[in-house]
Amino acid sequence: EMDLSAISSVIDIGGGSGTILVGLRERRPQIAATLMELPTVAAVAPDILSEYGADDVVVEEGDITVAPSIGRHDLAILKAVVQVLPPDQARSSILNAARCLTPGGEIAIAGWGVVDDDRLGPPEGVFLNLTFLNLYRHGESYTEGQYRAWMTEAGFRDISRSRLTDGSTLFRARLTG
């Protein structure tokens, strides 16, 4: 569980309907929340958020592989985003996510399909690597080393990788500054 006590603003990048933000705001209602999504998803997100009483979540149309958010936030969440992008877009999504953060802000990248640097484990990462190769034009599971290199290039430090209870991976890091 993340300590959100120092977080006043969060952006969920590629967050679909925004339910992660709804859950965060149930725990910390004072957090300012922004959902950044592609235009087709951003168009329907406000209605879904309204059903949860989260009308004050800002919905921003955008593509993190092209440009950062217009605002600055203490925490950027990318769940099941980086894993489905080609390598150049995966890298640019992390670089642009860093540009969405305040100095010292945090990034949380969560999802399935991360493999060890030798690409031999964990088993679910290897399985998803094969799946991604078949589903996406440039699909592959990225290694821990690739994530660390992209985050380091973007200015992150204190990079950690942990395994969540569902078996997925969570990378966390803090922006220098």
Feature locations, PLM:
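Alpha-helical subdomain
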Residues: 4-5, 9, 13-177
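Phosphate/ATP-binding catalytic cores across multiple sugar-kinase/actin-like superfamilies
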Residues: 1
